[in-house]
């Protein structure tokens, strides 16, 4: 792992230990039992069946590489804007230290619309998956670069047992081989190298030949313009996770519609 990713994972393990003391598993299970589920994969497929791009629109205040992206940050307003302009799903950052996110942001965003929501965080422990279900998430992210294959398989199985969808994230061919051992149809290709934080959308295009037909390719990071979108769609990549381009716009949903529709 990179120094940056290493540091993030160390913090996550510390956070899990602290959270287990303040919110025991039984408490989370009770919270999770009161939450409804929305069909994350189904929402993506519905867009595809209509001939449209499926946009997983991100609610993201900041990032380690770019700093604060949006000073006026109201998750509920952002979520409504996305929902009103054609997003398929939401992705909400819940990492506090590195991305200035929170569980509360996810809860506020989900309550403001009917879209399924991905908890965007660095998952290293089953506790975080139950935590995601308890806060109202419909899907979680698993990052191949952060996990051993057997660990990832166990985490996926637990997520699916709770009814959560799984987006597995890769950056290169070796990681894709590992990701394809999972059952999830959602394969995210992060165009940002987590080792260097450099970005190139060629990363997604370079992995398409290895992608089975039964998987849905989600291109992540570096999609900043309509030209980027058209380039991807010309190669039959029709699912996008986009944050920065929307967060920097005055009206995130309007920017979404301008880029995609």
Curated annotation (Swiss-Prot):
Q: Name one GO biological process term.
A: L-tryptophan biosynthetic process
Give a yes or no for keyword Signal in this entry: no
Keywords annotated in UniProt? Amino-acid biosynthesis, Aromatic amino acid biosynthesis, Decarboxylase, Lyase, Tryptophan biosynthesis
Q: What is its EC number?
A: 4.1.1.48
Q: Which reaction does it catalyse?
A: 1-(2-carboxyphenylamino)-1-deoxy-D-ribulose 5-phosphate + H(+) = (1S,2R)-1-C-(indol-3-yl)glycerol 3-phosphate + CO2 + H2O
Name used for this protein in its record = Indole-3-glycerol phosphate synthase
Q: Which family does it belong to?
A: Belongs to the TrpC family.
**Which domain of life does this protein belong to?**
Bacteria
**Which Gene Ontology MF annotations are present?**
indole-3-glycerol-phosphate synthase activity; phosphoribosylanthranilate isomerase activity
Pathway(s) the chain acts in: Amino-acid biosynthesis; L-tryptophan biosynthesis; L-tryptophan from chorismate: step 4/5
Q: Where is the signal peptide, in residue numbers?
A: none
- Class of this enzyme: lyase
